[in-house]
């Protein structure tokens, strides 16, 4: 995979080391967020997979997609590409549940121009368990 962004970060494989989220030059000590350890991450991904594939007629697929996206980004299972994979999972889930008929959903631009709010909203869920504000933000991203 010569010339591919992130090629030194084991593309396609779950991470085997601790990662963190923060600005350029951040370390584990001053990270904005530290995802689960590699050991816990595997358990979290298994739980997420079960949730994604559970037959759940009571949760609207758009809301479930938002919850799945939050959880995937919180788990952060790869050293690189989590955002891209997370956005792809949204599209695949909505196609599977017939919310989309074609893979024509582009929320990357919305999330890019609202990056600070995107991170802040996910942090609110982690700090306070406030999923409602996250789901509203996610639905706004889908709508726009």
Q: What are the roles of these predicted feature ranges?
A:
Residues 1-144:
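FIC/Doc superfamily catalytic core
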